[in-house]
């Protein structure tokens, strides 16, 4: 396994390449802020998010772990893919990013507040290289897609809805 491959989001460096970590103090601040949002919302009906009254969470809360599915973060529909001859094998797993770089390249703390009941999951689609599905002259390439995640701005002590890139699918390209 490539330890420097993204753990969740396309532009997130792997363990060896990480320069930023989210401290416990920051996690506590976020938990408290999310708990406040949950309190404002009161009791939630079945199937409704505790957070849907908050504009940022309403716009951006689609990746809540309890409701997200792998197909939500695929770049395209399931096989057969019309625009690619074939697809390399893909391993999917859900992943909870705690930080990332936005589509504009800015470092952000992504909201994960398990105690308050709000966790965000994206599905990571990793190509299994070394497959012969691409024939002898092709190679697996990764598509990119965007997801909108709830982030926390420590300076302003507020939530934002921001765009991140995820990798998904592994089409074959002949080069």
From Swiss-Prot:
Keywords: Disulfide bond, Hemolymph clotting, Secreted. Its main location: secreted. GO terms for cellular component: extracellular region. It comes from the Eukaryota. Disulfide bonds join 8-167, 10-95, 60-161, 65-121, 75-168, 88-140, 127-170, 134-172. Pfam families: Coagulin. Coagulogen is a gel-forming protein of hemolymph; it hinders the spread of invaders by immobilizing them. Coagulogen is cleaved after Arg-18 and Arg-46 by a clotting enzyme contained in the hemocyte and activated by a bacterial endotoxin (lipopolysaccharide). This cleavage releases the peptide C and leaves 2 chains of coagulin, A and B, linked by two disulfide bonds. Coagulin molecules interlink to form a gel. This is Coagulogen. It comes from Tachypleus gigas.
